[in-house]
Amino acid sequence: MAFVAGVIRRLDETVVNRIAAGEVIQRPANAIKEMIENCLDAKSTNIQVVVKEGGLKLIQIQDNGTGIRKEDLDIVCERFTTSKLQTFEDLASISTYGFRGEALASISHVAHVTITTKTADGKCAYRASYSDGKLQAPPKPCAGNQGTLITVEDLFYNIITRRKALKNPSEEYGKILEVVGRYSIHNSGISFSVKKQGETVSDVRTLPNATTVDNIRSIFGNAVSRELIEVGCEDKTLAFKMNGYISNANYSVKKCIFLLFINHRLVESAALRKAIETVYAAYLPKNTHPFLYLSLEISPQNVDVNVHPTKHEVHFLHEESILQRVQQHIESKLLGSNSSRMYFTQTLLPGLAGPSGEAARPTTGVASSSTSGSGDKVYAYQMVRTDSREQKLDAFLQPVSSLGPSQPQDPAPVRGARTEGSPERATREDEEMLALPAPAEAAAESENLERESLMETSDAAQKAAPTSSPGSSRKRHREDSDVEMVENASGKEMTAACYPRRRIINLTSVLSLQEEISERCHETLREMLRNHSFVGCVNPQWALAQHQTKLYLLNTTKLSEELFYQILIYDFANFGVLRLSEPAPLFDLAMLALDSPESGWTEDDGPKEGLAEYIVEFLKKKAEMLADYFSVEIDEEGNLIGLPLLIDSYVPPLEGLPIFILRLATEVNWDEEKECFESLSKECAMFYSIRKQYILEESTLSGQQSDMPGSTSKPWKWTVEHIIYKAFRSHLLPPKHFTEDGNVLQLANLPDLYKVFERC
């Protein structure tokens, strides 16, 4: 069989352009990189990026640069149209980011592009739409600010395979943040911001007057910024200059963070990375890497920038000599900063595997019981003189006075809807936590409490017994089971509503979150918390606890936050309600939050009143779900009327309520079910946790008040000891990372102290 030669045909221009566009624009982050470089070439000082669905649905980038002339709008999206060079020889001295005229053209071939632009001498702005590089209609005059606004919609709408390959919006959004973050570090005199469409808070935000170190701190955190070394060298023979910041020997990460700019262009260089990491190998632990930000300025005639479609690679003369010079300079800087080294040690927790792989043998220290047949002698340094099961008298003396917001307010315990989350979490041996009473008992007990403290609400208390059968509607009727809880004699009242019949939740997302909590549980740490003896509070954030012969310092804030998160996940849609007797307007709460420095509001975010109205309308749309699943009740007028009751006799710190409302609208992922439940639970847990800034220390009180007869000087301490840490015993599954991030620290061990003091 003879082979027939194929016919060579000229490809259609549209096909050629679409193929070329697929090379230049590989993902949304590439498109944003190209447009940011155009903004920088236009002398912009403020660049704002807004994206939707990781940039696949919408990319909007706005600058305050020079703008585009109306006469140029006809050809601005055609290939090989640029204002930055005219002849090929101009490449030898090119100092701008763009030079081929392919960025906007490539984007217009794979997306719908709209450009709104205004020049300094223009009387108005002009808007034009483009498809396949061609102007769809004559530019229309419109209102607009100085600069250019480019809107890119439905990226890769005509390349189905590429769109299917980029199916993870979160991953694409992460790459966008990475690109913008790197350019913001290099261009410290320019303001950058990135946020999702509809969000009020930017995920990346830098200020025009911020330094390079400030931007590194904003993007990568304090852990990097406080360990930086400034580097800089120049070699006139090789015609290059280098400056930047590198991490010292105290800082290391699992993956190298390398920001390299050559002639202000973000590029990659495997050879330079390898040369620098060779230097760090002598200073950092094995399999760890440094943070590197380097900016090389090489004579333009020595650099070839036209070697890759995406421009992420460049070639330059004397490459080996320049790399060697940079390597030597960094080595000299590290050598001079190696006079001291900081190490973070982790004390071995009881029962953890030691270097030999064997678990540490627990020292029980309890005197030999009558059932012990061994008769082994217990030495003084092994003896535990406390019992985690013993109760204190003040546990029954609930404070009446209020110094902080997070303590229970009713003189008698208020029965809530706290039920066991799962058989794994429910520990039968916990005799101290208040168990949920039977419906009849709840009605009787509520009636007795009302007779003693709130006579005027006895009628409501008698209705606490549910009238619906187990098989009736799954909706909760909280109004018939209200129990008034007095904050103080003259203050506002709140209502704790019980929900005694448990709903069965079979949502896959919730079950998955429960499984994740169970899988990351640290059994040894759980055993310690279950059998600990509370020693005392250091401050609202830290507390001391003893387990066997060891003394631990525990981060109450982080542990309580994890506790409430797990309660929200395991008791999902089964909460009682803390109902405010006077509804709290969401608008007022949002305004209070925006007035707080914690919100991070600036004038660029828009008027506070408009943001507050948006928050109210947004949360009103989510009111049904919030009430059904989380017992956060919002009425039709936009008032907050109820909060979830997570633990009996515990009221969250209401000083944090405004920020909580703000973060509900801005920090929760409302697009995906699992992420929504997870982030909403975390925000709610953060609000309920013990937080130092919302606790009023007794040292700030006047001596006259603290010396008043019958006053309790430390009610928040009572709450921490008898409510929060009591809940840790039976309801907290501590995650493994608590043993590594400093939230649980071992301070002392009795046998080790005995070696020093030789007595106990």
From Swiss-Prot:
Keywords: Acetylation, ATP-binding, Cell cycle, Chromosome, DNA damage, DNA repair, Nucleotide-binding, Nucleus, Phosphoprotein. Residues 363-375, 434-446 have a biased composition (Low complexity). GO terms for biological process: DNA damage response; DNA repair; double-strand break repair via nonhomologous end joining; female meiosis chromosome segregation; homologous chromosome pairing at meiosis; homologous chromosome segregation; intrinsic apoptotic signaling pathway in response to DNA damage; isotype switching. Residues 400-409, 455-472 have a biased composition (Polar residues). GO terms for molecular function: ATP binding; ATP hydrolysis activity; ATP-dependent DNA damage sensor activity; chromatin binding; enzyme binding; guanine/thymine mispair binding; MutSalpha complex binding; single-stranded DNA binding. Pfam families: DNA_mis_repair, HATPase_c_3, Mlh1_C. The modification N6-acetyllysine is found at residues 33, 241, 377. ATP binds at residues 38, 63, 82-84, 100-104. SMART domains: DNA_mis_repair. The modification Phosphoserine is found at residue 481. PANTHER family: DNA MISMATCH REPAIR PROTEIN MLH, PMS, MUTL (PTHR10073), DNA MISMATCH REPAIR PROTEIN MLH1 (PTHR10073:SF12). Belongs to the DNA mismatch repair MutL/HexB family. This is DNA mismatch repair protein Mlh1.
